[in-house]
From Swiss-Prot:
Record protein name field: Probable serine/threonine-protein kinase PIX13
Binding-site positions, ATP: 93-101, 123
Enzyme class: transferase
Positions of S-palmitoyl cysteine lipidation: 4
UniProt keyword Cell membrane, yes or no: yes
Gene name linked to the record: PIX13
Subunit organization: Interacts with the Xanthomonas campestris effector XopAC/AvrAC.
Main location: membrane
Organism this protein belongs to: Arabidopsis thaliana (Mouse-ear cress)
């Protein structure tokens, strides 16, 4: 499954969640400031020597923090029922392999303070979910210990009987996927400046994971897992497939092939060998989506264009061809020099050999240099797309999927 401290293999724990209505499987600790922190004793132990900590030296990422044990609030099921109005269908934000995600409101009980409460997102396990306790536990163990501006914040959890729930900060603008691929008056096209801002934020989140002392490989980087707050700040979500990276003496780990078609790195799909820079490939795919406004995989496109990266790689290195695949919803309002530099960076990220791809730290630096150039976007211009591109745009039907949709797992296991 995902990243569970102390569990080097993909084998699930042999025990099951307690059904006694208490939280016996989770140890509770009290700190000096009365904040409740949690650690789990089933399947994956949390301790200060778990091997997951911020790296020292120049590679350490200064904007984030890793705690020795999770620092989370324990919610009662009654609290979360009340906050979501008994999990009403109209409060559903999305649905995926784990279950449904509901919008909720927590009352602010501070004396004398007038407030409408805090908006939250509550992920509730579907009893028939194939992911279940292991993924719930991994989210608690991992997100409960990290704090970074570009990682979605886990506020707490609930474990009562068979009920497993996770409580996150609410991300007002939804997922990058919805903004890039959904059509209609309710969806506002993203400007070039916003797209670049989102790319930088997501890159910083990945760079932070890779900079930990025992590198974390995210393993499922895609547009639907990039959530946006009210100011379009990007935060990476859903860490159910994350894994600890290789030791210093190894180049990769070997594991079951899981992820999403169109985003998984070719070496991982072919061999089960997972590199830290396998994440960089996924980032390159998302950069291609940001440039084109097209989904990584779309079987409704003409033959030869189903896989976005395989189709457009030749277009990324040539200026004239790049113009023909740029997202028409940008209406030509983008500095072409910046777009070309982003395309060149995407091409490097999509390199066939992991060792030749840039690190995420280098990706962040490159994107920040592009942003710092501060070129003025061009006024609207008419670009002449090639017939195949124009035909493709006419046939494309965006996949209107939530950020919590079920994963399309690569079928091959290793």
């Amino acid at each position: 499954m995902g990243l569970c401290w102390g569990s080097p293999s993909d084998s699930p724990p042999t025990t099951t969640p307690s059904s006694t209505g208490n939280i016996s499987s989770v140890g509770t600790f009290k700190s000096s400031n009365n904040t409740t922190t949690t650690g789990t004793s089933r399947g994956s132990n949390i301790s200060s020597n778990s091997g997951f900590s911020v790296a020292s030296g120049e590679d350490a990422y200064p904007d984030g923090q890793i705690l020795p044990i999770p620092n989370l609030r324990i919610f009662s099921l009654a609290e979360l029922r009340a906050s979501t109005r008994n999990f009403r269908s109209e409060n559903v934000l999305g649905e995926g392999g784990f279950g449904k995600v509901f919008k909720g409101w927590l009352e602010d009980k501070t004396p004398g303070k007038q407030s409408n409460g805090t908006v939250i997102a509550v992920k509730k396990l579907n009893a028939e979910s194939f992911q279940g306790f292991e993924e719930w536990q991994c989210e608690v163990n991992f997100l409960g210990r990290v704090s970074h501006p570009n990682l979605v914040k886990l506020l707490g959890y609930c474990l009562e009987g068979e009920e497993l729930l996770l409580v996150y900060e609410y991300m007002q603008k939804g997922s990058l996927e919805n903004h890039l691929f959904r059509k209609g008056s309710a969806v506002q096209p993203l400007s070039w400046e916003i797209r670049l801002k989102i790319a930088i934020g997501a890159a910083k989140g990945l760079a932070f994971l890779h900079a930990s002392e025992k590198q974390v490989i995210y393993r499922d980087f895609k547009a639907s897992n990039i959530l946006l707050d009210g100011s379009y700040n990007a935060k990476i979500s859903d860490f159910g497939l994350a894994k600890l990276g290789p030791s210093a003496s190894q180049s990769h780990i070997t594991t079951r092939v899981m992820g999403t078609h169109g985003y998984a790195a070719p070496e991982y799909v072919a061999t089960g060998h997972l590199y830290v820079k396998s994440d960089v490939y996924g980032f390159g795919v998302v950069l291609a989506e940001i440039l084109t406004g097209l989904h990584a995989l779309d079987p409704t496109r003409p033959t030869g264009q189903h896989n976005l990266t395989e189709w457009i790689k030749p277009h990324l290195s040539e200026r004239r061809k790049l113009r023909s695949i740029m997202d028409p919803r940008l209406e030509g309002k983008y500095p072409f020099k910046s777009a070309f530099r982003v395309a060149q960076l995407a091409l490097k990220c999509l390199g066939p050999e992991p060792k030749n791809r840039p690190s995420m730290k280098e990706v962040v630096e490159s994107l920040e240099l592009i942003e710092a150039a501060n070129e003025k976007p061009l006024e609207r211009r008419t670009t002449r797309a090639s017939p195949s591109i124009r035909q493709q745009q006419g046939h494309y039907r965006p996949q209107q999927l939530s950020s919590f949709r079920p994963r399309q797992n690569v079928s091959r296991a290793h």
